[in-house]
Amino acid sequence: MIGNWNYGTGRRKSAVARVFIKSGKGDIVVNGKPIKEYFARETSLMIVRQPLELTEHAETFDIKVNVTGGGETGQAGAVRHGITRALIDYDATLKSALSKAGYVTRDAREVERKKVGFHKARRRKQFSKR
């Protein structure tokens, strides 16, 4: 807890989100913009709101987010992870419901590196018999 703000760090792919929540009327601001302006896709908005809707705190908190790196999907996942951690910082009894839904666990899937002699991570060069 920092002042009257609860804090959580979220990560997904190469995106990192720093999330601050405090009691309010449900405003979510991402990098200085309203959430609907920052995330264009409806699925990204849905991903970000999932932990709030699960715990029935959608209209209870004002949320301020700083997110860097990655694309839209990675950033949305990072914000969701950060909101989950901030909610647990606010009220530890929410952890069981959030972990049952799978929001507490960091999604460890990362981009696989390109290997030498391959076109991409797994795509090999075309084989010629003759």
Swiss-Prot record:
Protein family per UniProt: Belongs to the universal ribosomal protein uS9 family.
Keyword Ribosomal protein attached: yes
Recorded superkingdom: Bacteria
Protein name: Small ribosomal subunit protein uS9
One GO term of the biological process aspect: translation
A GO cellular-component term linked to this record: cytosolic small ribosomal subunit
Alphabetized Gene3D superfamilies for the sequence: 3.30.230.10
Keywords tagged on the record: Ribonucleoprotein, Ribosomal protein
